[in-house]
């Protein structure tokens, strides 16, 4: 690589450390540090990764089987229950698009329900899709799904009655498993960059996050 492409230099870094550095661009992050908890959520699994002074504490990493795919399935289920007129063969694709475009994490689910009930015109969005068979447009209202989808991280029982361990519990467990001298800094600087999905509202979370 260096000889063929004349690359002047190369720096290899751990993704979790880079995620912490990237979180510095958020207004919610006060102090710039490479100590914190990184939640790396992909399509099928979510990892909780403790980082202390730029070093990943590998022995304390935990994972949970809730990730982006589960949010999509849950939103799909919510839309089906409302019978909003989505073509059946496009329900999964529509749920994924709604997740990536409209979903966000809320600090208080009860207050969020109240917001939508008091002023639905302000919070309910409309999604427009094209029926793949007849090429006609279909429009659906997107309401509670906007925050209920990501809420399964904190209330996994919403999507699966057998899943009882929330992301909050896992984060606390990960920190408690870390060396005692880094626990306080981890709790203090708990910044959680969600790497998936890259939709509106998926910003670093600061404590208390649920």
UniProtKB/Swiss-Prot annotation:
Organ and tissue specificity: Expressed in kidney, stomach, spleen, bone marrow, uterus, testis, placenta, skeletal muscle, mammary gland, lung, fetal liver, and fetal kidney, but not detected in small intestine, brain, and thymus. Expressed in low-metastatic lung adenocarcinoma cells but not in high-metastatic ones.
Keywords from the named record: Actin-binding, ATP-binding, Nucleotide-binding, Signal
GO cellular component: extracellular exosome
Family assignment from sequence similarity: Belongs to the actin family.
Signal peptide region: 1-21
Example GO molecular function: ATP binding
Function text: May play a role in the suppression of metastatic potential in lung adenoma carcinoma cells.
Domain of life of the source: Eukaryota
Protein name, UniProt field: Actin-related protein 3C
């Amino acid at each position: 690589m260096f000889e063929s492409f004349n690359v002047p230099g190369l720096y290899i870094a751990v993704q979790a450390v880079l995620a912490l550095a990237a979180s510095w661009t958020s207004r919610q992050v006060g102090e710039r540090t490479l100590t914190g908890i990184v939640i790396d959520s992909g399509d099928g699994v979510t990892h909780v990764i403790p980082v202390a002074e730029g070093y990943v504490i590998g022995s304390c990493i935990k994972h949970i089987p809730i990730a982006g795919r589960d949010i999509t399935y849950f939103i799909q289920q919510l839309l089906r229950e409302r019978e909003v007129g989505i073509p059946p063969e496009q329900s999964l694709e529509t749920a994924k698009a709604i997740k990536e475009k409209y979903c966000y994490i809320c600090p208080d689910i009860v207050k969020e329900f109240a917001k939508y009930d008091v002023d639905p015109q302000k919070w309910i969005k409309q999604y427009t899709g094209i029926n793949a068979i007849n090429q006609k447009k279909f429009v659906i209202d997107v309401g509670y799904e906007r925050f209920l989808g990501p809420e399964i991280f904190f209330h996994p029982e919403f999507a699966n009655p057998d899943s009882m361990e929330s992301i909050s519990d896992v984060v606390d467990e990960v920190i408690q498993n870390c060396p005692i001298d880094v626990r306080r800094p981890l709790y203090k600087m708990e910044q959680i960059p969600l790497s998936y999905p890259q939709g509106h509202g998926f910003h670093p979370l600061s404590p208390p996050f649920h």
